[in-house]
């Protein structure tokens, strides 16, 4: 499922992502990034994915700038989504070992300039399992390979996306 973003979308996402980063760093919210990119770039990339999800499903993105740790990125069809983004074309679904009680479903999004490709999703209990813990060089993280994700095109027995 690919979502194309136009120049105005990109500008909005850049602004919100950068502002969220400033607020979170000023309020000492712990940065749980997994990777070598800067926290600013990761926050912008993350909001690009959140915004693209909202645009595709015709929901309103969360423009909130209050400091936060945890929570969810989108609410749709009764489920709370955490959208995990990467710029790696072969990216996997990755989250920290800090369990977020506010999330039902995790989504993998590949961000490539003006396009966001939603690869698939996993229910929380499919991702948060001991056998999915791997140290990728930044400490233990939950990792789910792409072939274990539910495909957006094929759907799921529960209509969630």
Which residues are covered by each model-predicted region?
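Nucleic-acid endonuclease domains
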Residues: 1-77, 84-161
